Amino acid sequence: IKVLIPGSNGKSQGGDAPTLGVVGRLGGLGARPELIGAVSDGDGALAALTCALKLVEMHAAGDVLPGDVIVATHICPDAPTLPHEPVPFMDSPIDMETMNRMEVDPRMEAIVSIDTTKGNRIINVNGYILPVANDLMDVMTRVTGKMPQVFALSQQDITPYGNDLYHLNSILQPTTATTAPVVGVAIATEQMVAGCATGATHGSDVEEAARFALEVAKLFGTGSCKFYDEEQWAHLVELYVTMERYQTMGDAK
């Protein structure tokens, strides 16, 4: 599913406001017939589509954002499960390369990637893990009313699936298919919850994630929400060259 909500000065209308992508990441909404009901893993799609619906309603009511917003995700009610430590992963009937090709749109100039991140013990541009932008932390504080929380990543989390390395989850897999900056929004819990667990969706958490993406979209279209410091990024590349190798399969056979 891909939804384009045109902005008043969006590029789809001939304008020059930047385009934000909101990607809902998941294996599936359900694990039928093994499990009955919606699974925890589907929260990313639910949040992304909630954001899309709200943007469409706002647009119809005359509250039009400056820039285009493209929301993309996929719906699968009967996805398989996979063994994974410490709890089972939800698999998907489509591979990550296909998912990225369909969901990571080249028109997206920055991406908010929303994914359930409950099945672990912890709560990028061109292969670099960059500092979290102050603008995004300001939005998070405003939306949640709490201090911003940042989840830890390892370098291998931003490498493509299929290279036999452990990945936190698919939250930053869009980085492997774009040159745009990608920020992961993790829907997390205090205790580990398997992606295939039913009855584990917390409506308030999904709503906060959707509202965060919407608030970022409002600011991004005006140019007042930076995902990273462009001068620092340029100097980083000048000193250490690019890290695009991490967006590839490397020397995997």
List PLM regions with ranges:
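Alpha-helical metal-binding/catalytic segments enriched in His/Glu/Asp
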Residues: 22, 32-73
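Solvent-exposed alpha-helices and their adjacent loops that cap or buttress functional pockets
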Residues: 8-16, 39-41, 61-65, 102-106, ...
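Glycine/charged-rich beta-loop-alpha catalytic/anionic-binding loops adjacent to active sites
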Residues: 25-37, 121, 194-195
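Active-site-adjacent substrate-binding region
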Residues: 100, 110, 116-250
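A glycine-rich helix N-cap at a beta->alpha junction
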Residues: 86-112
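Soluble metallo-hydrolase cores and metallopeptidase-like ectodomains found primarily
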Residues: 1-32
